[in-house]
């Protein structure tokens, strides 16, 4: 019989529940698992998770801090038994990567609004992950969707614009929500001009 552990993780474990939030599920397996729907589960092999723990990967920290065991084939708590992940040391390179994603998406949306929802979604991902990786590098990780507003200094952005970015993310990843209108795209583009300076300032607080 196949060894398997199932965990819930993410927003539901933070109590961040709203119409757009999904239940994130992790399935840990020791071999091929064709019966598990990859649309519904993040599927990881045990050795891959052990490797992520060993390198102090942000996803390992996320699971360590915000997951709940739902099912265990052998009564053990696999993630719990892995203990505390290694120290996160990739803050600089990860933040540089997300800054680049932001810059590229911002350029793309200014040139053409064809795939604007996708570009806004990437900008949201970049800003959120930048803040999360920064907070993790300081040793007090914030995995919330609103992490850019919870770090110090926070991103000074109009709440309406931030909600447009969040909606774009939900539309792109879950196909959920109201389509984003031209005037909303314009609002978002105008408001995110503050992002590059914020990113630079945030990383100087180390």
Predicted features, each with a name:
Residues 1-3, 13-19, 28-206:
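Catalytic core of pol beta-like nucleotidyltransferases
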Residues 23-25:
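A structural signal for short, well-ordered beta-strand segments
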